[in-house]
Regions:
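N-terminal Rossmann-like or analogous alpha/beta NTP/dinucleotide-binding catalytic cores
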Residues: 1-92
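Active-site cores that bind ATP or allylic diphosphates and position pyrophosphate for catalysis
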Residues: 80-161
Length: 161
């Protein structure tokens, strides 16, 4: 790679009903057509296998437990419809609405709920500034809780999002 990095290709196959082997073949073909080359992946191997997300679930489960123990994630049993109703309330301008925090517990609260049957959201630190430079669009500064909010990290069907 031009910047000295390595591109590791992983196949997001967590939505089993919509994942088929022919889609993986098409992904390789499309990426090569765009001139993309990867250092390791499902078709060539490498030291960071496995390259199918579904075969890395134990790694994701361990990360989930670390986040849960640190009080950085919380369970949310709101349906999409519940969230959409809350977001339909008037809000400033045409900005993207932010999750209203309906299920958000007090900061640092550690949930003992299981992963199954409930969505889990990552708690952002409101007011924290995130600055980065987009190679195409230039410098950006985003403020947690204002420009973006808590986000889904684990789905109620027991898969990472």
């Amino acid at each position: 790679m031009a910047a000295g990095g390595a591109l590791i290709l992983r196949n997001d196959d967590l939505d089993a009903p919509r994942c088929r082997p022919e889609f993986v073949s098409a992904m390789f073909e499309d990426m090569r057509w765009f001139g993309l080359r990867w250092s390791e992946g499902p078709d060539i191997g490498g030291p960071y296998a496995p390259y199918a997300q579904s075969r890395r679930l134990s790694l994701y489960a361990a990360a989930f437990e670390t986040l849960r123990r640190r009080g950085l994630i919380y369970p949310c049993d709101c349906s999409r419809q519940d969230v959409l109703r809350a977001l339909s309330a008037p809000h400033r301008g045409d900005e993207e609405p932010i999750y209203p925090g309906t299920c958000r517990p007090a900061a640092g609260a550690v949930s003992t709920a299981t992963r199954a049957g409930v969505n889990w959201l990552f708690r952002v630190s409101a007011g924290q500034t995130l600055s980065f430079t987009d190679s195409a669009l230039g410098p950006h500064t985003e403020i947690a809780g204002q420009d973006f909010g808590d986000f889904l990290v684990w789905r109620k069907d027991v898969f990472p999002s």
